[in-house]
Design a protein with these regions (language model features):
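N-terminal active-site segment of His-dependent metallophosphoesterases
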Residues: 1-46, 164
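Conserved catalytic scaffold of divalent metal-dependent phosphoesterases
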Residues: 5-13, 59, 66-168
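Hydrophobic/aromatic beta-strand patches that form the interior of the parallel beta-sheet core
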Residues: 30, 52-54, 106, 131
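Short, acidic/turn-prone active-site loops that include or flank metal/cofactor-
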Residues: 34-35, 54-61
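Short secondary-structure transition/capping segments
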Residues: 43, 64-66
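A short helix->loop->beta-strand "cap" motif at the edges of active sites that frequently abuts
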Residues: 47-51
């Protein structure tokens, strides 16, 4: 399985008309934070591959659509997504708000990707498990910044979903 991972800045090798020629055989794309959502949208449109993203601590204009943020008009999807420990990608169309840009938000969720699988030595197809963690260490009380204890608590909440997957 070949995964294209992008983060932090717009890459001219990707953000051009030859992007598919530069990366012809990728299976999956991970957008690992601090990217403008228009760039994520471009990546989804050009590559037409399963794309997953998290937020970093910058470019947070659309963060409110995926999380409950006091003082904003958060989407109903934010409430249901933040309370779940395990999300199967076959229900994401009903979960996502209109601002998804074609990519699936993986922040603080375990995603069992039935459409993206890999084969082990025994040739059995196994769904890929992807767990996303958004944000950074708290340094100015901005959005998507967490203390060490806050992050530990968020990570511990992901454990039941990971254990459930292990039992399958």
């Amino acid at each position: 399985m070949k995964i294209l991972c992008v983060s932090d800045q717009i890459d001219p090798l990707i953000y051009n008309s030859n992007a598919v020629k530069n990366f012809p055989d990728i299976d999956l794309i991970l957008c690992a934070g601090d990217l403008p959502m228009d760039y994520v949208d471009f990546i989804v449109s050009v590559f037409n591959k399963p794309t997953y993203f998290i937020f970093g601590n910058h470019d947070l204009k659309e963060y409110k659509y995926y999380h409950n943020v006091p003082g904003t008009n958060s989407s109903p999807a934010a409430t249901s997504q933040t309370n779940s420990h395990f999300v199967s990608n076959n229900i994401n169309k009903t979960d996502q708000h209109n601002h998804h840009h074609g990519a699936i938000y993986a922040g603080f969720k375990n995603l069992r990707l039935k459409l993206v699988s890999f084969s082990k030595n025994n040739k059995k197809k196994t769904p890929l498990l992807l767990t996303g963690v958004s944000g950074s260490i708290k340094y100015n009380n901005g959005l998507c910044q967490f203390t060490e204890n806050e992050m530990k608590f968020k990570l511990v909440k992901l454990i039941p979903g990971l254990l459930l997957n292990k039992l399958r």
